[in-house]
Amino acid sequence: MFTKNHRRMSSTSSDDDPFDVAEKYYGEERKKKLNRVRTFSAFESTKYGAGPISPLRPTYEPPPVIKETSEPLSSSSSTSSPPTLTPQTSQVQFNLGVGKTKNGSAIHSDSEEEEEDEDPVSNTKKGEADEKDPFDTTDSKLENENSTPSSITGKEIIPHPTGFRGSSEESAIRRKPSIIPIYHDNISQESVIRNANTPTTYNREKFHLRRGSLDESTFIRPKKYYINDVQGTLRELLANEDTDNNCQITIEDTGPKVLRLGTANSLGINQSSIRGTYRLSNLLQELTIASRFGRHQIVLDEARLSENPVDRMKRLISTSFWNNLTRIITKENIVDMAKDTKIKESWIDDQGKLHENQESHRIYVPYNRKDQYEFFQLIKKQRSDIQLDVQYLPQKIDADYIKSINKKPGLLSIATRPDPQAPDSGSLISWPYVVPGGRFNELYGWDSYMETLGLLTDVKIDPSGNPRNLRHLELARGMAENFIYEIHHYGKILNANRSYYLGRSQPPFLTDMALRIFNKTIEVTPELMDEAIDFLKRATLAAIKEYETIWCAHPRLDDKTGLSCYHPEGKGIPPETEPTHFNALLKPYLAKYNDIDQLDFIEKYNSGEIKEPELDEYFLHDRAVRESGHDTSYRLEGKCAYLATVDLNSLLYKYENDIAFILQSFFNDNLQDPYDDNNSNKIHSSKIWLERSHQRKLNVDKYLWNEQDGIYYDYNVKLQQQTNYESATTFWPLYAKLASSNQAAKLIDQSLHKFEEHGGLVAGTLKSRGEVGLTRPSRQWDYPFGWAPQQILAWIGLVNYGYDGIARRLAYRWLFMMTKSFVDYNGVIVEKYNVTKGAVPHRVDAEYGNQGLDFKGVATEGFGWVNASYVFGLTFLNLYAQRALGSLTPPEIFLRNMHPEQRKQYK
């Protein structure tokens, strides 16, 4: 028996979040719900109180709140699963042709026939101006990252006067949808909020239906599609739209750019069109993900296909990409983690069997970490199915030892803690970390700092007062803990935790990284103050050790200038490079030794049998370039170990001031060092660090600053002259607060224009790079390429000196370029971009190519510091700028058409 509190509605409606993470959206629970789908349900209690349902009664239900939770690689994955086991794609059979269609499957059409539920367009008359100045953002507040729009939740929105789409209204609100992507704007200012109990008065002139908003939800329930054959729809979609057969749908594909799908309310009988590259590529991504979760049938929210690209990028980075880039060493994945794919060797297993030219599985443990050695040996004993070689490192690690194990590569152990579930078992738990890209398993140096900036952006206190995204805080903390471990056991923060990187560091960021993690910890979990102080103490002591024993010691410190250089330890040819990487370099030496085989030459050169001083110097600089993190660039090639670079000395200046600040603010300017190698119980105070920073500034001003050009140059300590190479690292003194206010002003006035391009800051200028060609190929850290860390450090530096508007402008340029590529090219996020191009900035013609391009159907990781640059960069933009970004407004148009008062915010 039906009561007056019931109303008839579609059974496919639910309170499920249309933007939920893939595991929940396509997981087992959704599969169970799909089994109950039918054309119509019985009746369901109305949410609008007692009384009969009138045709004028509002029928709108506000969209569910967007939740930010963690998304694993697959429904069965966990932190203990092997990181290399990404979601399998074997279920997706791409490009197999078009199968027969059934009810609910895709029907591909570009016809103009009537559709069930088409997109509304504006009722505003052509040429009629809105009452509100579109450039006036005085009512707009900076949107918090990953916050959900309160304007569409918890309250009722004024419905259409008729409560439904009647025939009398059809001519005004129905037309064929545009091929241009229509993005749902989840934070529309046009949303009208009222109290449900307040009498309603309607003003038709106030109601505007606009592309790119959820206004249509005022009249109808958000649309859902019923796809009863995921694989068949995938094949149909790819066969018709993927004309270049790369399993992606982009603006370069020449298909009809329209696909008809069955609606969920009709169980697939009625059809509705999906149009445009962006929505179709999103459909491809969603179908690919559903297939990897083993789904054969799904109900798909239209909102997931039409999601504002800024919101979609931010959501995927926060809930999916970080998870897929997370690694943690466990019992289950230790073999996959230890495997070295760059170097193959011959080895004998425990049964005496010889394995030739195969990948080995080895892990090295510090000489004084017996607990880790026994733990890994226990894993080896418990798992007879694995071949794991566990080795101790010697106490003294030098260039000769590093060279001696070049043919026995292995993973270097990192920080662990006792398993709280079995404290007496000897079982250990590793700290998690984020890798740069999907193909990596190692912890990298300055990548981790940039990733930390992005991770911490998501860690907040929600409106209810509870911390959210604490997992991201744990990841940031884990990377810092691993750095502390590396400094104490390997002497430095490593390029990466592989044996052939033992002599090589990367740009130092530990002090700022530790301070940001400390501040975020006490912000969201103030009850952990004591633990946070202990963490800050250990990080500071580690940074002091790194500073004194690595960066300000031989061979990296130049005594004459008092400045530091990238100058790693090592001998021979780097073993991790591709076998053919040095072909051109070695060719004349092979001829010199009677056309000796290249592998034989490398063997004899590395052993010292062949001595070539010129090659020794070349590989010294080659290792130094890799330590700088800028591998490779003509700025550094052939001279890096002799350069006192502006980037390194800016970071060391920041170390000096950060350490002084920490000692003064948290440790009463008196911190005892229990790690002092001389066992002298050394006491650290701020005085010496302030003196060091003062002296470094004097040295930088003398040797690196060029008053005439208004720029910082590197200084060649061997030639005793500036290099005059114009590099974006000239902005790093702003990040470190090393420049005076006059130097900063001159740098902005005379040099910024040399680096500002369509997509942000270029790594170096065309003038400095020079001509490139077959004999002088492009280098990836030179013009015309731009990198996320260069943007991030410049933004921070500009704000440090009050140039907020310029930082905002540069951030908009970089984020627009990323968003445009994401929309036009199937959700791509890559390692680096050509910032001078507006059309295809993600295509990079330089060594190593561009990571992040090679995916089938859906990108699942992006690239670590590029992901970070996006979510971090959004914090520099107000709501108006973020909306312009979502509508793909190019920087030139965005800045040119801006209200004069607003334009001041970008200067």
UniProtKB/Swiss-Prot annotation:
It is found in: Cytoplasm. The active site is at residues 631, 831. GO terms for biological process: trehalose catabolic process. Residues 71-91 have a biased composition (Low complexity). InterPro entries: 6-hairpin_glycosidase_sf, 6hp_glycosidase-like_sf, Glyco_hydro_37, Glyco_hydro_37_CS, Trehalase_Ca-bd. Inhibited by validamycin A. Changing residue 687 to N: In strain: 3153A. The keyword Cytoplasm applies. GO terms for molecular function: alpha,alpha-trehalase activity; calcium ion binding. SUPFAM superfamilies: Six-hairpin glycosidases. Its main location: cytoplasm. Residues 111-120 have a biased composition (Acidic residues). Residues 1-20, 39-172 are annotated as: Disordered. Pfam families: Trehalase, Trehalase_Ca-bi. The keyword Metal-binding applies. Residues 125-144 have a biased composition (Basic and acidic residues). GO terms for cellular component: cytoplasm. Ca(2+) binds at residues 242, 244, 246, 248, 253. It catalyses: alpha,alpha-trehalose + H2O = alpha-D-glucose + beta-D-glucose. Keywords: Calcium, Cytoplasm, Glycosidase, Hydrolase, Metal-binding. Substrate binds at residues 439, 446-447, 495, 504-506, 576, 626, 629. Its EC number is 3.2.1.28. Its cofactor is Ca(2+). Hydrolyzes intracellular trehalose to glucose. Belongs to the glycosyl hydrolase 37 family. This is Cytosolic neutral trehalase. It comes from Candida albicans.
